[in-house]
Amino acid sequence: MFAFELEFLKWLEGLRTSFLTVFFEGITILGEETLIILLVVALWFAVDKKLAQQVFFVTAASLSLNGIIKNFAQVPRPFTKGINSVRLDTATGYSFPSGHTQGFATWSSFFALKFKKTWLSILVSILIASVAISRLYLGVHYPGDVIVGILLGVGISILGNYLFKKVKDLKKIYLWTFLILTPFIVCFACIADPLFADMFKTFGMIGGLAAVSF
């Protein structure tokens, strides 16, 4: 976290209005886990089970990596530096990188890459930027948090899209991802800290997907 990032958040805090706060509280919901779960369930039952698996996997893998980085970096949230943060119930754990931004950037850009429609790519870009701005406006993340979150989210969706095209047996992708992440999760499991709870839950989802695929 740099000094100018804190000053930027203070400047944004001065721009808050009742309307903007309600607006950005609505936008930030796009990055929440509940929406991702509802999306996957809808895809599974109404669209395509394989697509649902892929969206679920890339997002869960992305959020697991997000949790690992958070707990290595251990950057405190802006409210610990005097920022009057809003919607603190969405700001669990450490600050860097932004989980909401990364999660949304992952699954939304995955759709953009999958369907290759110009209008969809433009819409996804606007929404990713909106979610990132919402996290800054609400004072729960620094600019660097959301920028890195976007880069990681889009990067993981690109990698996932590539692997799904090249590797025909999806079970291998699920299993190897689970095995690669396991040492990090076991390491953090030795530390009794409630801040790791979200990472454990997300990792468990990947393990479940790997298990049911066999």
Predicted features along the sequence, with ranges:
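Hydrophobic alpha-helical transmembrane segments
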Residues: 28-48
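Interfacial segments of alpha-helical transmembrane regions
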Residues: 43-62
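Juxtamembrane helix-boundary/capping and inter-helix hinge elements in multi-pass membrane proteins
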Residues: 17, 46-49, 114-118
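N-terminal transmembrane-helix/juxtamembrane module of multi-pass inner/ER membrane proteins
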Residues: 1-35, 66-93
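Transmembrane alpha-helix boundary/anchor motif
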Residues: 3, 47, 64, 68, ...
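Membrane-embedded catalytic cores of phosphoryl/pyrophosphoryl-handling enzymes
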Residues: 39-40, 53, 63, 78-205, ...
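Short helix-capping/hinge motifs at transmembrane helix termini and TM-loop junctions
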Residues: 47, 73-74, 139
